[in-house]
Amino acid sequence: MFLRTQGFKKLLKEAVAGGGLLVGNDGAGTCLCGNYWVMWIKDGCIPKKELAAIIELAGEVPEPGEAFRVYKEENQYEIMEGPVYNVMKNAEECTEVFDITRIVIRNGKGKPLRILQDRFRRIILIDERFIDMIDNTVLDMGSAEKPAKEARAGRLPWVFWYNNIMALHVMPIATEKNKNLISYLEETRIEKMEKEHAASEETKEET
């Protein structure tokens, strides 16, 4: 997996404490879903630490065709329906590449948001935590897992990262506070990070 273990665990715990963590099995892999993100990992490809984190919170991994939402108190069985759960298919259909720029701004609540920009200079914002989590250096080099591709977008209003065993969807964040700044930045080409899938230790800018 191209996600750092610590960030992965924190993401799951926050989902359980919030609107619930959906854990599903579509027969080919495991789907995990929070309030603003979805990921899918191919069967047999979840590392031991990450699998242990899922079982610790959910109590079990669902059987093929099953899904349930994990809350603090209990698990509730659900049905995975809708295009959002076709995680890998959606990722593979994306055609537009977004550069991860060097600029980080903050929304009205102080949350750091990373600016991503495509070839048309269009800008989207995502939670900075995902830039910190995505790291190709944590891949299992003894396996056939490939590095994650660049951030991409397609017909769904999400940002996607994926490789040959997993896919991650992240919902962009809208912020009225920085609306004028975004319009201004879309008039120029922003410098991108040198290492897109390493921790974000670059110089950050706030507004």
Residue map of PLM features:
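Flexible glycine-rich active-site/ligand-binding loops centered on an Asp-His dyad
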Residues: I46
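C-terminal functional regions that serve as terminal interaction/effector modules
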Residues: G34-W37, K42-D43, A52-T207
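Intrinsically disordered, low-complexity linker/loop segments enriched in Gly/Pro
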Residues: M1-I41
